[in-house]
Design a protein with these regions (language model features):
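Glycosyltransferase-associated regions of secretory-pathway enzymes
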Residues: 2-20, 31-32, 36, 41, ...
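Short glycine-aspartate micro-motif
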Residues: 23, 214
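Glycine-rich Rossmann-fold phosphate-binding loop(s) that bind the pyrophosphate
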Residues: 26
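Active-site region of the double-stranded beta-helix
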Residues: 49
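Short, conserved SAM-binding/catalytic segment
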Residues: 61-66
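Short amphipathic alpha-helix with an adjacent loop that forms part of the alpha/beta core around
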Residues: 71-82, 184
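Small-residue hinge/turn detector
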Residues: 200-212
Length: 365
């Protein structure tokens, strides 16, 4: 079996001294990780990316100006030696572990999984001056498209909004009061039954038009949100140093940069020309947009043209994979990641169980 290990991101480079690193997975997860890989100077230590997708084999991944080849799993097995280390850079890490465990030539090879690498809790700062004007109105908006009942678990999260923010107006948006045909992207997503993608645009449009705070229904509020209202706009990092407005974000009515973020979707179609669905997550659009305005994907608090970007601990202490916890005295909301876009045959409960088994293997070393 593979030898599973874990460490902090900033310790990984040191552990690779005199070793050759192979990254398993060259897809979107690896693309999003490019910033972290370059930050800790790992690019020059990567011998190759491994990918099971035949169409990617023989291509290259460019990181920090270095072109890194993509090879097949079988070629990797032939290349491996006593100094080989694997870093799984895919959200399908469980399947990849099973594949490697079945290969006897990989017995004892050191392996790390990116989503399990530990990250420090970054400090957050809030304007607590009593004379500071609250720019964002006391409104909490949420979307529920699809005409189905809201599951009981989510209703419990909604109760937390009322408990900690009793003087806020809570507004539901659905087919009855929101025009999902406003842009082609949402119109196509709605007819494809992809409600989460409808919300990706709708929440930007709603907050720009009315002002307030948006929360996904799988977000639990853990303290009063008033300190966040003193921003013109706020949003937050999630694991991987990506921006996700589904975690919870807010803005004053008519905020200019939010309008620009919304307008991006007018040039995007949900159904591609070949009939396939454009499942690019909102994190890609929103992170790219803010990077073009000067965002640094370092997980630290920053102010970009009136947008306050908070570290992960503020709005997303948990991650989708439920393998890390950055809950702190700076946490306002906790996103529990229903991830309805995650169309896999294995449900999330099964994934969480596998994660616990992986953590146990790491502890056993």
């Amino acid at each position: 079996m593979i030898r599973l290990l874990n460490c902090k991101w900033n310790e990984l480079n040191e552990k690779l001294t005199n070793k050759k690193l192979y990254c398993f997975g060259s897809g979107s997860q690896a693309e999003w990780l490019s910033y972290e890989i370059c930050q800790v100077h790992l690019a020059e230590k990567i011998s190759a990316f491994i990918d099971n997708n035949f169409n990617k084999q023989g291509t290259f991944v460019e990181l920090d100006g270095i072109k890194i080849p993509v090879i097949s799993f079988n070629n990797f097995v032939k290349q491996r030696n006593n100094g080989t280390v694997i870093l799984i850079t895919s959200m399908y890490y469980s399947d990849m572990l099973e594949q490697m465990d079945r290969e006897p030539l990989l017995d004892g090879v050191e392996c790390y999984i990116e989503v399990f690498l530990e990250e420090p809790i970054e400090k957050a700062y809030f304007n607590v001056a009593h004379n500071e004007v609250e720019k964002i109105p006391k409104k909490i908006h949420y979307c529920w498209f699809g005409k189905q009942d809201i599951p009981q678990q989510y209703l419990e999260y909604l109760k937390s909004w009322e408990r900690f923010c009793p003087d806020y107006e809570i507004i539901r948006w659905d087919e009855n009061n929101y025009d999902y045909d406003k842009v082609s992207y949402t119109s196509q997503a709605y007819r494809a039954g992809k409600w989460a993608f409808v919300s990706d645009y709708a929440r930007l449009d709603i907050i720009y038009t009315y002002g307030g705070i948006y929360l996904d229904v799988d977000v639990e509020v853990v303290r009063n949100l008033d300190p966040l209202l003193k921003n013109q706009m706020f949003c937050g990092f999630e694991k991987g140093n990506l921006i996700n407005t589904g975690l919870g974000f807010g803005a004053e009515k008519g905020f200019g940069l939010l309008r620009d973020m919304r307008e991006m979707y007018k040039n995007v179609l949900f159904i591609n020309s070949d009939g396939t669905l454009n499942l690019t997550p909102c994190t890609k659009f929103q992170t790219d947009f803010l990077e073009s305005r000067g965002l640094k994907r370092n997980g630290k608090q920053q102010l970009i043209d009136g947008i306050r970007v908070y570290p992960r601990t503020v709005l997303a202490p948990y991650d989708f994979f439920q393998v890390s916890n950055q809950f702190s005295d700076m946490t306002f909301t906790a996103h529990h990641y229903a991830a309805t876009w995650f169309g896999r045959k294995n449900n999330k409960r099964s994934l969480v169980q596998k994660n616990h088994e992986i953590i146990q293997r790491m502890r056993e070393k």
